């Protein structure tokens, strides 16, 4: 999946969270040298859990790989991708590559028909506010609207009439209506101060600009949102103005087994057989379906091999402009440790879900496990790419060319000549802190850490702030963190806490002062269970009350645990306080240098802002054979029966006995060379006439290194074909009103009305 998962590595303890994940099942969100840690528990699990040292991970230089002299490896033309911006539309490139020249109106239609929704992308697909996205982007909302006795995630949801569509909360659909360039103003302000002040000045100015632009459009209640978007690591800065829609209802979502057919085994693979789609509807302020001219009609005729396609969506994050030293640090330290944390937490979650199915359903833990599993697969694939000497050699070639271009210009050399070297020094500083980085990987994430431990962390700060007579507003802000920490089942709370304590012991060593003070000769699980049972902070409501009335003290068991490991935590925090601003400034200067040298010929890294990626419908070689371009319902049923209906390939009853009119020849999924990443999930796949031919939901395994390099030879995006969507709506779900709307644009309030019109 390729949605952009922000729940892991979010604002919680931001200096240490360090990750924005991809849930696609592909694209999706990003680590070990060979051999990688096992993804499932094995007899060697205890060995795999030991923290690898930097020395273990660094391989000696290899001049030849499979007969290839690495010194002769050259970068590809599109190694840095094809995620083109709407600020600098690739008009000439499209004309050269695809044989037509889109005008300004074409790009405007593409921009206004697209939407950004939570962690994903979407689009208007009818003049009546109908919105198409992925099923995996809708899971949380499907769970949200399930009534008592319903299990809509498993059973699916279909609104047969307009009145049956169900309102969803916290769904924001953002339509990009304007882009305003502020690069000169921002760069002038940054250049006017010393290097140590630039980060703070930049942040302050961006906040000021954002507030001013929003005020010009009517303020916070205007229905507009403004976001400052920095491209090229700050080399370009613009205000993106969005029309935000929040009155949204769920219209249709297939069963989980259909939207995620094949489960984890088929994730990030092709051939694929998924109906990973869902439909929402935007309503206006009067409660009527939104009337809009900005939508993409369905192209029910579909595509053929060699056809060009365009994916318009919001890729979440890439690091294709990072230096080789930064990538090597990720490979050897940060991303590797994060991957191991994901694998450990997956085992904890899986064990709890199996032992407590009802509690797991109540806390929506299956959705969390799906996201975590997806992220684990993404990070594993990206790390494997970073271990590929040829990929690193291509990145080194790109970096050499960049440095040479800087050196060739005296003015650029004076300003930017030492940036790459200085960035390498910063990475070495961080390497020195590898043990504490591992011990606190994604620390504070509410889905990967104990809620009690997180509350203890914030509670300690509340207590200290009160003792130091901090301003009431600051204390209230810290209390918000306690309030927003979600409630967790006590058994899962203790298991996650024990897993964190085990990591601290593994990475820091059992003799480390923090570990010794924390465990005192006991096992991590013994300590965790005593804390959960003995603290006032294991229940969110009680925790808030205790902090408000002062009954929660430094002697609380959870607070004492935080005090025990705090010195090690602060060691890492101090490092990031020291090098973080410098690293950010170096990245911004490198971005400016790249833009001055290459201009818009090299697309910027993804920023969860709107992009357009072109591609061609074509296959690729894999596993000694050739992948088909299209899969069909024939293959879908073959997959089910070949696996004897096992869990990941099981089918709901309505699919086990389909009507004889279901056309099994219908194309179901297809692949293209379009460049995507986490956040693109739900993006419309368009033909040259801006008609929808599919909705992208994943990438193949070969696309996983796409975080840092685009390899068009085998990188493929995976898309649900609209012909399969229409066939399923018509023949399986009997939703004639949606088929009518998607094929003609006509809105029917009921199935009976739609039947009469058809």
Report each predicted region and the residues it spans.
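Terminal presequence/propeptide segments associated with secretion/organelle targeting
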Residues: 2-4, 10, 19-758
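Small-residue packing motifs within transmembrane alpha-helices
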Residues: 13-15
């Amino acid at each position: 999946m390729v949605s952009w998962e922000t729940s892991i590595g979010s604002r919680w303890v931001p200096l240490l969270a360090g990750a924005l994940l991809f849930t696609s099942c592909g694209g999706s969100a990003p680590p070990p040298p060979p051999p990688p840690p096992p993804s499932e528990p094995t007899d060697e699990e205890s060995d795999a859990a030991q923290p690898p040292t930097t020395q273990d991970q660094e391989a000696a230089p290899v001049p030849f790989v499979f007969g290839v002299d690495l010194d002769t490896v050259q970068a590809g033309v599109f190694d840095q991708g094809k995620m083109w911006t709407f600020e600098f539309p690739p008009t000439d490139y499209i004309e050269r590559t695809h044989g037509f020249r889109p005008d300004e109106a074409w790009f405007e239609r593409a921009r206004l028909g697209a939407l950004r929704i939570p962690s994903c992308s979407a689009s208007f697909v009818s003049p009546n506010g109908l919105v198409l996205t992925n099923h995996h982007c809708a899971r949380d909302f499907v769970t949200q609207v399930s009534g008592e006795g319903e299990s809509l995630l498993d059973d699916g949801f279909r609104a047969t009439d307009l009145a049956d569509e169900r309102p969803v909360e916290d769904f924001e659909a953002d339509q990009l209506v304007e882009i305003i360039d502020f690069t000169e103003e921002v760069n002038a302000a940054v250049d006017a101060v010393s290097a140590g002040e630039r980060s703070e000045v930049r942040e302050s100015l961006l906040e000021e600009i954002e507030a001013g632009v929003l005020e010009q459009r009517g303020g916070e209640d205007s229905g507009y949102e403004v976001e400052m978007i920095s491209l090229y690591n700050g080399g370009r800065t613009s205000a993106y103005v969005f029309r935000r829609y929040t009155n949204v209802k769920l219209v249709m979502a297939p069963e989980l087994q259909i939207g995620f057919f094949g489960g984890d085994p088929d994730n990030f693979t092709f051939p694929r057989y998924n109906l990973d789609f869902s439909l929402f509807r935007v309503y206006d302020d009067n409660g009527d379906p939104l009337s809009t001219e900005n939508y993409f009609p369905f192209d029910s005729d579909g595509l053929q091999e060699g056809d060009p396609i365009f994916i318009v969506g919001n890729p979440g994050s890439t690091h294709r402009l990072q230096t080789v030293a930064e990538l090597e640090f990720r490979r050897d330290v940060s991303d590797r440790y994060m991957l191991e944390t994901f694998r450990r937490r997956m085992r904890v979650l899986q064990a709890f879900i199996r032992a407590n199915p009802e509690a797991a359903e109540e806390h929506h833990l299956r959705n969390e496990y799906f996201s975590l599993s997806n992220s684990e697969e993404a990070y594993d694939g990206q790390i494997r790419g970073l271990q590929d000497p040829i990929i690193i050699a291509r990145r080194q070639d790109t970096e050499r060319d960049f440095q040479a271009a800087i050196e060739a210009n005296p003015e650029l050399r004076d300003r930017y000549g030492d940036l790459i070297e200085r960035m390498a020094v910063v990475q070495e500083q961080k390497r020195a802190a590898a043990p504490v980085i591992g011990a606190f990987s994604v620390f504070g994430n509410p889905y990967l850490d104990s809620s009690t431990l997180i509350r203890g962390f914030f509670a300690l700060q509340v207590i200290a702030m009160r003792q130091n007579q901090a301003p009431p507003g600051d204390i209230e802000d810290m209390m918000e963190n306690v309030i927003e920490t979600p409630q967790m089942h006590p058994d899962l709370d203790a298991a996650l806490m024990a897993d964190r304590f085990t990591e601290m012991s593994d990475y820091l060593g059992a003799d480390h002062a923090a570990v010794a003070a924390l465990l005192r000769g006991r096992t991590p699980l013994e300590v965790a269970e005593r804390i959960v049972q003995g603290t006032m902070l294991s229940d969110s409501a009680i925790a808030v009350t205790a902090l408000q009335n002062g009954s929660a003290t430094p002697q609380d068991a959870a607070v004492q645990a935080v005090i025990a490991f705090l010195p090690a935590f602060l060691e890492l925090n101090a490092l990031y306080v020291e090098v973080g601003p410098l690293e950010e400034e170096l990245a911004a200067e490198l971005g400016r240098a790249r833009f001055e040298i290459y201009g818009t010929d090299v697309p910027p890294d993804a920023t969860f802002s709107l992009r357009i990626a072109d591609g061609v419908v074509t296959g690729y070689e894999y596993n000694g054979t050739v992948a088909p371009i299209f899969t069909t319902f024939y293959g879908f049923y073959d997959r089910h029966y070949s696996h004897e209906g096992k869990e990941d390939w099981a089918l709901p009853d309505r699919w086990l006995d389909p009507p004889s009119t279901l056309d099994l020849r219908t194309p179901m999924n297809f692949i293209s060379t379009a460049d995507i990443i986490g956040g693109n999930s739900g993006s419309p796949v368009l033909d040259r006439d801006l008609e929808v031919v599919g909705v992208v939901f994943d990438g193949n395994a070969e696309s996983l290194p796409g975080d840092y390099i685009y390899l068009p030879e085998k990188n493929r995006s995976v898309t649900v074909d609209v012909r399969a969507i229409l066939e399923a709506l018509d023949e399986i779900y009997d939703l004639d009103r949606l088929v009518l709307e998607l094929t003609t644009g006509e809105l029917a309030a009921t199935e009976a009305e739609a039947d009469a019109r058809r």
